[in-house]
Structure formats: C-alpha cells, structure tokens
C-alpha cells in the first residue's frame, strides 16, 4: 500500500504573536519518537492515527501534532509500523519469531535470551505476558530502528518454571499479600484469606502463583509453607534455601528407607574386600564435621617406600541405583553449606552414621592405594573395595600441631604423609597448577544464630596434606578409565573439567593489575600463563590488594564443571581429573563409584547422553548451592554490621557498577554499596572498560581496587544489603 504523507497546513498564514490553541509542554523529537514507538508496542495489534497518538503522548501543540504526522510517515518508511489504511498505522507484525529464555527483573529491565545465542532482546513489562524468570518463551521481535536496542513481545510461554516465591506476609482484615524478596519480581502477590494456610502477619512464607490475569497488576497466589517468624534465624536460613529452590527438610519416605538399611557387615562382604583393619588409619577433618567420608592409611614397606591408602566411604554399596534415596540424592546433587548449618545430600543415618568413617568402627570403603618413593613418585597404584577401621579422628588443628611440634599420636605417619604431600604439591605447581590459596571468612555464631565474631580460616599444612592425597586419588581414578590400555576402547566416564581462561578476560585482568604495578604475560603456552598467575599471586601475598586481585583473577577464570567429554583441568594442570573422594556430599562422586565398580568388573560402557545430562544437572546444582551459601554469608554480614551504624571503616573498592561502588571492608571483609546518587560532588558516569566511575566536570575517578574510607549508613536484613557513605 502506498504511503501517503498528509498535506501540511501553511503555518506562515498564522498571525505573528498569536498564541496557538492547546499549547502544551514541548517534547524533543527523539523523546517523541520513543513515546510513539512505545504506544504501538504496548498495543501491537491496535491501529492508531496521528490524533490518537497525539492524545496518548500528551501533545496538544498543533506544530508538534504535525511533527507526529512526520514521525509516523518516517517510521512507516522504516517498516517499524505499517499503514493499514489512509492515516492509520499498526506495529509491523512482520518481525521474526524466536525461542529462548525469559529473564525477569524487578526494575523492569526484562530481557529475552535467544536459545541460538543471539543478542539479548529487551522486553517491556507490558509485553512480558507475565512470563517468569527462566521460562522458555516464544517472542515476536519488533522491527528495529537503526541504533536502538532490539525489543520484542512474549507471544507464548512454552515451558514454565516453578512459580514459587519467598517473602513476608502482610495480612489485613480482608486480604493478604506476600511482600516478595525476589529480585526478579517487583509485584507483591495477592493471597485470598482462605489460601493463607494459617499464616500470620509478619510470617516468612513460600507462596505459589496460581493465576495472573492479563489486566491485573498483582498475581494471585496461595501459601504452600510457613517458614516461621521473619527475623528468626531458622526461618531466614530456610527462606534462603527456598529462594534458590533448595529443600530444607528431608522427605519422610527417604528417611524411612534409610532407617531400613542394615549397619552390620556380613562375613561374605568382608571376604570380597581387601582388609585394611590392621593398618594405621585415621581421618583429618574440620572440628565441627560429622560426615567423615575420607580416611588415610599409611605404612612403611620393606623397600623403604610408603604405601598410602586413600579410603572413601562406599556410599553406593548402601544406596542402590534408582531407589528412593538415590533419586533424592540425584535431585539434590550436592550438600549445601550455609553459614550455620549443613543441608545434607543423603539422609543423616547414612552420612553421619553408616557411611561416616568414625574411629574404632569397621567401615566399607572404595579405595585408591599407592606406593610412593621418598620423592613422592608413584611406583604403582590400585583401585579396590576395602574394609577399614579408623584408629583416630584428628581435627585439622590437632594434625597441624603434630606437624609443627613433631609430637603426638601417629606422628611418624603424619610427618611422612606431610613430607610426601609437600613434594606432590611442589611438582603440581611446577607443572602449571594455579595456586589460589585464599582464606575463608567464617562467623562465630551464638545460640540464637547471631554472628558475634568474624574470623579468617587459613589453609595450613594439615589441610594441604589431605588436599594433595585427595587430588592424587581423583586424578588416578580418572586416568584409570580415561586412559585405557592399548587396544581397549575408552568408556563413558564422569570427569571434572576446567577450560582455559577466556583471552579477552585475561587481557582485561592484565590491564587491571597494571595500576598496582604488576605485570602478567597473557600469551605463550597455557603453562606460561598459569606460571605467570602463580608468580603474581606470590607477589601480592600480604599486600592490601591481595584479596581483590585474587578475586578478580578467579573471575577471569572459567568455572569448573562436570562432563563426559574430557578436556583436562586447567587450574590443576591435570590431563585427567574427576571427583571420587566425597560421595557423601556430591552426587557425581556416587556416579564415579558406580562406573568404577562396573568397569573393574569388566562391564560395558554406559550410554553417554544419560550421564552427560546428569553432569549438566550436577554442575547447575553446584552453582545454585554456591549462590545459596553466598546469600547466607551476606545475610550474616548485614546482621553482624547492624550495631555498627555510623562507624567508620577502611576498605577497598571491590566492584564498580552504573548504580554505585561496592566496598569491601579490610577489617572483616563485609561488603556494602555506596549508591551513585550519594556521590553528589559531581555527575558520575560508569566507565565499564576501565572499571571506574568518572566525574563529568571534575574528572575525579573511583576505580576498582582503590582504597576508600566509608561510614556504615544502613544495614537492611530483608534486602541483605549494606549501604555505606563516603567518610571524607
């Protein structure tokens, strides 16, 4: 259809100085264009003429109405809108359809991520179709103006995520709402009084959205569980778990199944295993640990070498494939470690009793046994099912005291193992392993769950001793399956893999550290790069910028994950690596144990796709668990700082965003935000490339890594947010 531009009136005939009828506030042309496009996008199937458009966007000035006419003509020429009959236009419906994932944000900046990996597309709330974060959707892409970001409209929700949200109930006389704490949903959820499930005003609750009518501002929901009174520690920790879709209690059917598992070991089972009960064996674990899933045995051989057994709880002997316990463990994929509690992958009877390698109790294990010479070179190894009896349970502190003083129980074995571990570690770093030796922030918690002290957990020789032998066992198991003898076909297996770092991220990291006076070579072999990183990490030890540089270095790395396709582990510099040593708390280790049992017995390879899907699930759940752990740490940080409002602390800028500066305090590593709106001495703009905020007039910079002094302004527990102000 021809595009007809309506004739303009001759405005020169107007008398000079005569006020036009309906003169309103003038709009700039670009703002008018955006406003007009928004009208069409909000009602993509409705036609509009220039009068309707003018009224909707608030244009009363006759001159600007004519400008609306011109803009409509131009947008039609660009195929953004279509003229369906003379002077009436509709949004161009010829935009392509795409399928992908919807990302909802409470600030209205929703987006659509195409499954083919294309550019993210902005989805205005009015065009969201009430899709939820993570939904698989079909989107119609709008015709795009040159230079503008792509936009679209959700036309169909193909797959829905669970529509459950955590928050605080607000109960009035005739109605109730859930005030959500979710960063993806700005709208409170309306709850009919008969759907409260006994919930009271101020309770922490989980609510499921059951309906969201097209024209309704708020979705309708029903309470599915009451977590307790908001502010109480258990309620808040359970709320964090629920927020991430993690379970906070065990199904009774699974616990009943665990209760039926016999603890006694039959003589026939012992007969089929290597017997290590007479060999010195002990565990070394954190002092608050209950699930001891690994033990070490050590004895000196007649030839002067040491035989070291890495004994791992034989969980899969008790947990049968596809049983109710296995299905629950597979769903969870990992134990979750919050600040004050552990949410186990397996029922307590298994992880803390039957499978826990407690002292003076006979236990079934899957073991990797090594003969090492005085240089810690493996002379031979074997993987076998065993029975052990631990002689002693050491805490890390107790084992460390033996190492430092040379005195104590089983001192000969511990000192020998420590010497071997140091040599294994030294050789690993020479091969290109990266030494991220960061300290952990820990909280001392009182009986009410309140944090009373922050301290730093530092890895010492006793920790590193255990780490090295676990790494050795994991690598050996992976090599056993992944590197079969000549003439044998490689079989499907579960590997722990770690890709090389992204070159662009490494370049940005190298640029970042130059401001501190450090250099990093980012080209050359992968060993050259890893050795350069290790040299850098050595140089920053004890410096104020140490924690920041290590944090940014870790961000530049890829995330390790599980896969049936082995590509090696870059960070550890291992060609083959897996997770074998923690089946009580990681489902991939259970998969590895089952595959090992099958292949040791000469079994055929399993179907790869089934295990690759399980690998993807476990990698995903590992990340979810880590996010929940971080959320619990953040909650306790805010709680710890509540009585420190107005106090001044030194810190370092740990993050720079368009909305402000994140500052990590030197004293306790608590992190808070200095909002950009509070930087009122200038207008600051975010320079993403240089990790800084730059003042437009005075050119003052706030850069990542800069030292800064702040005052604690606010500690908001509900939002898990600390707000700081500049102290100077």
Q: What is each PLM-predicted segment?
A:
Residues 2-309, 316-361, 394, 692-693, ...:
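Charge-lined substrate channels and their catalytic hotspots, especially those that engage the 3′ end
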Residues 119-124, 185-191, 669-686:
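A short macromolecule-binding patch
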Residues 55, 206, 212-213, 239, ...:
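Electropositive polyanion-binding surfaces
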